[in-house]
């Protein structure tokens, strides 16, 4: 059988622990037998990041700017325990954070929907994609404990020394204050990423803030989205038969719970942090969530939404059998292959991505799955497979 050819490589970012083991299995059993796989390989495993002083992460992000499509394995973001375990030179930053900053991207997370894994919300039939703004607000906030009576103010000092002051509160006793910010350029970039991705996936886009209460801060988000939509995207949305819809965040939550899904929900940083966990949990499993970083310049980085599955990795090292769900990691590869095919006009590659996704879903819907799904499925007859067995079962259906 002749293999599918590729003209341009995908940037491949290898990772850590159990997901690194699955990565190799997926390539060996599901990709390399069918594709003459071209990748620009970067080892983002923690040991190699440490050896290169994290330069490898920066290099992989810059390569994504060159080739426009990347696929990333889950990676460890070190804490104090990991610094000790891996004898690290320092506590390296989150690779995702570094890559996101270089590509100036927005993260879109969507559940993989299969029969037999039923959402908690019974009327959800289609995926709900969460787009989270990844800059500023409370995550770059400055906070202060107020010890007792006094006046707290916001002060803006212009380059010429002119001051603008706004009273926050006249304190009669102890309290707390918080200052947070955002920048128009980041909000504009977020808006364009959301509108572009909606066009890309032919889905309606919802955006929600609390502009009735936050008349300057949240209202600026609302205004920037509307201005960019009207000037750059309205006609394109009309042609695609999709719509942009703005509402208040509390109304959006109520509408989401009553909807059947099938749209992108753009959220400010904190709202996106909370709502993406709510949506993924309500759809059944974090191991069934895709994640793609989209930059307004048209760079795409695909990955699973979950971590490195540390507990299973330690079992694997002891020679014990694991039943680790590889679905989201498989879909990271299919997402990247499909986008590569789309950009290069390679229909064969796009068709293969569709075929692999169908084989994965068919395997689960026929009752063959990993332990985590077996515990929540509504299917009457279930066969629990180990990590490798599940991937081989998918290969049989390809």
Predicted stretch roles:
Residues 2-8, 18, 22-23, 28-52, ...:
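N-terminal alpha-helical transmembrane segments of multi-pass membrane transport
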Residues 35-41, 201-209, 233-246, 341-353, ...:
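Flexible, glycine/charged-enriched surface loops at secondary-structure junctions
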Residues 6-25, 29, 154-247:
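Glycine-rich phosphate/diphosphate-binding loop of Rossmann-like nucleotide-binding domains
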Residues 134-135, 140-191, 198, 343-350, ...:
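Glycine-rich phosphate/pyrophosphate-binding loop and the adjoining helix
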Residues 47-159, 163, 270-274:
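N-terminal glycine-rich phosphate/adenylate-binding segment common to multiple enzyme folds
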Residues 256-355, 359-366:
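Glycine-rich phosphate/nucleotide-binding loop
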Residues 49-62, 229, 233-262:
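A structured beta-alpha segment of the ubiquitous adenosine-cofactor-binding alpha/beta core
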